[in-house]
Amino acid sequence: MAKATKKAEAKTVTIEQIGSPIRRPDVQQRTLIGLGLNKMHRRRTLEDTPSVRGMIRAVQHLVRIVDEK
């Protein structure tokens, strides 16, 4: 008989863009696009991984963390 396994729910983080990428360095604009953000006040729920946390840290003045689960 096969074991019933539950997948552990991945931790998530919801971020909102609060700053405009206009007149920002190209690397910051690309980081926002990499996070799935490109317009003001858009929200995106992403997996909470070290790479995502690093991207958030790189543009922390342009985004805010809304929710962490």
From Swiss-Prot:
Pfam families: Ribosomal_L30. GO terms for molecular function: structural constituent of ribosome. Keywords: Ribonucleoprotein, Ribosomal protein. The keyword Ribosomal protein applies. InterPro entries: Ribo_uL30_ferredoxin-like_sf, Ribosomal_uL30_bac-type, Ribosomal_uL30_ferredoxin-like. Part of the 50S ribosomal subunit. PANTHER family: LARGE RIBOSOMAL SUBUNIT PROTEIN UL30M, MITOCHONDRIAL RIBOSOMAL PROTEIN L30. Belongs to the universal ribosomal protein uL30 family. This is Large ribosomal subunit protein uL30. One of its GO terms (biological process) is translation. It comes from Rhizobium etli (strain ATCC 51251 / DSM 11541 / JCM 21823 / NBRC 15573 / CFN 42). SUPFAM superfamilies: Ribosomal protein L30p/L7e. GO terms for cellular component: cytosolic large ribosomal subunit.
